[in-house]
Amino acid sequence: MWFKNLQLHRLPAPWAVTPDQMEKWLAPHAFQPGSSVEMQRVGWASPRDDGALVYSNNRQMLLLFRAEKKLLPASVVNQVTKARALEVEEQQGFKVGRKQLRELKEQVTDELLPRAFSIRRDTRVWIDTANGWLVIDAAAQALADDVRSLLVKSIDQLPLAGVHVARSPVAAMTDWLLSGEAPGGFTVDQDAELRSSGEGGATVRYVGHALEANDMRRHIEAGKQCMRLAMTWNDRISFVLTPSLTIKRVTPLDVIKEAADPTAQNDDERFDSDFTLMTGELARMLASLVDILGGDQQDAIQQAAAA
C-alpha cells in the first residue's frame, strides 16, 4: 500500500473536487489494451479492480495510471534491418541509401510489433484535496512526466503547481549534515551523497555509514554540497530527500505498522485502513518538511494577494 516514492505537486487547499467529478474527467481516458501494431498505450485503470477509476476515502483519492508497452529491443530491429538491407543491395546492385534504410527499419518495426511481448506498469497517484497535494509514486522523472501529461489531458485547466519552498533543499541538507541534526522532529540517518559543484563533479557517497562531523565538514569546506540525505520523521517514516524535493525510499517504521487496524475483517477493510493511515501520516510529514524548509512560497503569495 505505501508509496515508495513521492513526486510532489501542489493543488489549491482545499481543492473542491468530488470523486464523482474526478471519475467523469478520467472516464474518457480509461485504459484500453493497445492494438497489435501500437508501441505504447496509456490510460487510467481501477485502483481496486472494481471498475471505478477513483478510490476515495475522507477527502483523499487514489488513481492508477497504467502504461502498456511492447518489448521490441532496438538491437533486434537493427539486426533484422541490416539483414534486410543486404538482401535489397543484392537485388538492386548498389548500396542502400539513408532514406531507404530508414524506410526498411520502419517496415521491419511494423512487421515485428505484432509478435512482441507486452508489459504493463501501474503507477499510483494520491490526491489530498484537503491539504492540496498531488503525489505520484514514481522514482523516474520520465514516468512522472507521463503521468502528469495524462492528468493535464484528462482534467481541463488542472490547477497543478510545483512545490516552491523558501529555502533551497540543497542548502538545508548541507547545513543539517554539517550540524548532524535537523529541526522539526526530523533526524539525519546514515546515507548521504555529497557532490562538488566544480568541474568534474567529484562525488562522495555514504551508505549505512556513520556521518562523522569532521568528515562532513572537510567535504563541505572543499566545496561539496549534500545532494541526497536519508532522514527519519518523528521515528515514524524514513526516506531520502533530493534537491528537487522528490522523496525516495519511503518506509513506514514499526510504530506505524503497529498502528494498523487489527479489527479489519477483509481485504477492503484493510485497504481502507491502510490508505487512511498512509495518507494521514504522509500529509503530516509533508507539512513538517515544507515548514522546516521555510514554508511554501505559493501559499505566501496567495495570502499576500488575499490581504
Swiss-Prot record:
Does the keyword field hold tRNA processing?
no
TM segment ranges: none
Please give the superkingdom of this protein's source. Bacteria
Q: What are the subcellular locations of this protein?
A: Cytoplasm, Nucleoid
Query: Where is it chiefly localized?
Result: cytoplasm
Q: Does the keyword Cytoplasm apply?
A: yes
Q: Keywords in UniProt for this one?
A: Cytoplasm, DNA recombination
Q: Where is the signal peptide?
A: none
Q: Which InterPro entries match?
A: RdgC (IPR007476)
MF GO annotations: double-stranded DNA binding
- GO biological process terms held by the UniProt record: DNA recombination; regulation of DNA recombination
A cellular component term, taken from the record's GO annotations:
bacterial nucleoid
Protein function: May be involved in recombination.
The similarity comment for this entry is: Belongs to the RdgC family.
Name-wise, this protein is Recombination-associated protein RdgC
- Protein species of origin: Burkholderia orbicola (strain MC0-3)
What are the top taxonomic ranks of the organism?
Answer: Bacteria, Pseudomonadati, Pseudomonadota, Betaproteobacteria, Burkholderiales
Gene coding for it: rdgC
